[in-house]
Curated annotation (Swiss-Prot):
HAMAP family: FTHFS. Belongs to the formate--tetrahydrofolate ligase family. SUPFAM superfamilies: P-loop containing nucleoside triphosphate hydrolases. GO terms for biological process: tetrahydrofolate interconversion. One of its GO terms (molecular function) is ATP binding. Its EC number is 6.3.4.3. Pathway: One-carbon metabolism; tetrahydrofolate interconversion. This is Formate--tetrahydrofolate ligase. The lineage of its organism: Bacteria, Bacillati, Bacillota, Bacilli, Lactobacillales. CDD domains: FTHFS. It comes from the Bacteria.
Amino acid sequence: MKTDIEIAQSIELKPIVDVVEKLGISYDDLELYGKYKAKLSFDKIRAVESNPVGKLILVTAINPTPAGEGKSTLTIGLADALNKIGKKTMIAIREPSLGPVMGIKGGAAGGGYAQVLPMEDINLHFTGDMHAITTANNALSALIDNHLHQGNELGIDQRRILWKRVVDLNDRALRHVTVGLGGPLNGIPREDGFDITVASEIMAILCLATDIEDLKRRLANIVIGYRYDRTPVSVGDLQVEGALALILKDAIKPNLVQTIYGTPAFVHGGPFANIAHGCNSVLATTTALHLADYTVTEAGFGADLGAEKFLDIKTPNLPTSPDAVVIVATLRALKMNGGVAKDALTEENVEAVRAGFANLKRHVENIRKFGIPAVVAINEFVSDTEAEIAALKELCALIDVPVELASVWADGVEGGVELAETVVKTIAENPANYKRLYDNDLSVQEKIEKIVTEIYRGSKVNFEKKAQTQIAQVVQNGWDKLPICMAKTQYSFSDNPNALGAPENFEITIRELVPKLGAGFIVALTGDVMTMPGLPKRPAALNMDVESDGTVLGLF
């Protein structure tokens, strides 16, 4: 089997103008970035707003192994297969962060014969959106420090500045830094730090904004810190939301590319799901819904994180809710959740599959709580055995959830046809009746407790003293009616990454609350979730190179 990049480089791409023609998009509607990438103009986005709204399919997963379970691959393969069976389909997914690409992932544009192309560009600098977000974020940092240096008219307490700088890399050395050193000419010394770009609130804002005016409104609402009297300071107080929106004026437009089989795809925005809401842009998803009969999108990590946030935070900003949720499961992840060590996941172990099924079952139950039908997709690996597959299908039948084997990684579009047919049938026979998990009018504590007890199945929430103080501050400032965005490990329902499977009777500790008023939610931090990742012992970057003719090597 060829590597992902070898497969990608063997495909003859169509000009993006030709790919999107079937959607009613013309050359004049596009802002081209070479022959194979483009942004869609705002004029076209506005023109299609009166079109009917298509069906929405959300792809999520069980709690993953560190390598991931092929959610993006299944999303792409399912969309290709839907087109294959005659359904006019688009994809709306996130764009990769360069840090994890150079770190552990090595690429994040699908895999095998289910990829979005040109994968080298998508995984590297693409259309420059990440750089625009990084620049806007750091421009705000520079403007804050300049305000301090020039007399601090707003009375900002430099000890209570929340806003951090960002870079689109995994760089643990930058987590805690001191800026403003070197004497009076170099500013006011203060503690600072760097997050990875996809953890920036500006990324979340870009993915939730509906147009330039909404973007400016959200940017103005960002809380950058507090004054000496403990009152909040916003970007609007600094009067720089216009400048930040100017930096982002092109980044807000959705990017268009294609799959190996010519399915049009929006690849736009990419907040992490363990520290932000983990979904691609509202603008891309909404536009896809107006252009196609079926839109396939995804939410980061497992359904306890990405899907819950998609349904509680993103869906209220969309013209429709998901008609079906596809839960991606792999036998290796089920075995890991069933107690098998990482180095033994390729060995047949039917009992571990049965034990790990408790994890999948809980995710299915959770999706049904939102009133949406679920379909299980088994992402096939070469190490899977017939006995393991049969056991999983038998267990799915016991809870009356449709299940299909998908081999889109190895077999491309043909490997997803049965899944596509099952999803279409499920949507036709089981109309969704979407309902949110909680009402925003509940208190902050009640909303967090609802997520912990209903989705994670924990028994209790503990609030550290710092979090209790911050809840009082949130209430005092009138922010308590915002939804909650949980920051939690992706590997477990609990806040302990080692508690795999379907743990019960556990307690979750909230250590900190961070207001993200621009994004429109409150982040509740649990455990040791990092907003700036580090590199592994052997980064994927060690295998990367470029030849003299520009051919990229080592992405996978």
